[in-house]
């Protein structure tokens, strides 16, 4: 079943609200990408205007910026350490923006949106 992002059918009192029009195509949503650790897999999604969006299903590498030197390196992701979006994402190794992942260079905070951009970028965290 599709995800509908339109107005709720409940009134503030909890009663049922009547629709004054039907649902529209632009109110449709999609399932979240839920990017995991694994071999690189991407899904191309057609968006409005015929544009494309790259959904990253899984990847093992991350582009890491060292804030002190400004140098970018590619690191291997080992596991997810922290995720403020959902505490259960840590257990399931799901990567979202703001997640902290453990790499061979150290802990890295993800700055890109893997489900929207199709790439994982991050900033090295100095302890």
UniProtKB/Swiss-Prot annotation:
Q: Which residue spans traverse the membrane?
A: none
PROSITE patterns, alphabetized? RIBOSOMAL_S8E
Q: Residue ranges of region Disordered?
A: 1-33
Q: Which CDD domains match?
A: Ribosomal_S8e (cd11382)
The signal sequence is none
Read off the InterPro entries from this record. Ribosomal_eS8, Ribosomal_eS8_CS, Ribosomal_protein_eS8_arc, Ribosomal_Se8/biogenesis_NSA2
Q: Quaternary structure per UniProt?
A: Part of the 30S ribosomal subunit.
What name has this protein been given in UniProt? Small ribosomal subunit protein eS8
This protein's species is: Methanothermobacter thermautotrophicus (strain ATCC 29096 / DSM 1053 / JCM 10044 / NBRC 100330 / Delta H) (Methanobacterium thermoautotrophicum)
